[in-house]
Amino acid sequence: MPFDLQGKKGLVVGIANEHSIAWGCARAFRSAGAELAVTWLNDKARPFVEPLAHELHAPIQMPLDVEQNGQMEAVFDAIGDRWGRLDFLLHSIAFAPTADLHGRVTDSSREGFARAMDISCHSFARMARLAEPLMKGGGSLLAMSYLGAEEVISNYGLMGPVKAALESSVRYLASELGPQGIRVNAISPGPLATRAASGIQHFDQLLADAAQRAPLRRLVSIDDVGALSTFMASDASRSMTGSTLYVDAGFHI
């Protein structure tokens, strides 16, 4: 039975194109009846994201570069002005400088480490803070993670420690926001051929290995991630918080 998001309002951050995990989630949210706010990174990304936002009939479409002062606040102000509330949020953004992603964590630069943490982890805490007053009746905050948070993944470099910090932040945010009825969870998909993943060296081999290693002997799709995300945004998951949930055909075991 499909999960019902009728009447719910959600923010989706991280759509880059039609291959994005965030797009698979947004499409599933919309199919379940949610009304969405959608963001794009910058003017270069806008032509790829705006047609998808139109397809979703998103009434709020705005730029959001978490490194730019004021842009995040402007998005949440627009949500407050139009809807007066927010029911769920999906954070699906991550970045590390190429040298730090491909090199050893031992050799990572101070600046690269700090920037990766700011964009990929601290931005989720900032969104949680801005979402809190809009979730007076409770809500669901979701962050995309990856197995590299807990296992060493070749060529994942600096993103491993950063995703570990993100998953830890999920637990702390869940503890802090739980009394307000706000649930916070991470979703950890298996390897997917997305734009973000294309920056990982030898990623094609990682995909092939994942399909062989996973007990179900296959890769997952953005639609698989969208289905789990819709469940986690819905009231059906009302007793679930502080968890990292895997949708990876069993790859993590």
Model-derived regions: residue spans:
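A glycine/serine/threonine-rich, flexible loop-to-helix segment
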Residues: M1, E50, L158, P179, ...
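Canonical Rossmann dinucleotide-binding motif of NAD(H)/NADP(H)-dependent dehydrogenases/reductases
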Residues: P2-V38
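C-terminal substrate-recognition "lid" of short-chain dehydrogenase/reductases
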Residues: D4, G84, L134, R218-V247, ...
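Catalytic loop of short-chain dehydrogenase/reductase
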Residues: G14-I21, A94-R129, G137-P179, P191-A193, ...
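A short hydrophobic alpha-helix cap/turn motif
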Residues: R30, G84, M135-K136, S175-Q180, ...
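Conserved mid-core segment of classical short-chain dehydrogenase/reductases
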Residues: A53, M62-E73, D77-R82, H91-A114, ...
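Short, small/polar-rich loop/turn modules that mediate ligand/substrate recognition or access, typified
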Residues: G178, R183, M240-G242
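Conserved SDR Rossmann-fold cofactor-binding beta-strand/turn motif
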Residues: R183-A193, A233, Y246-D248
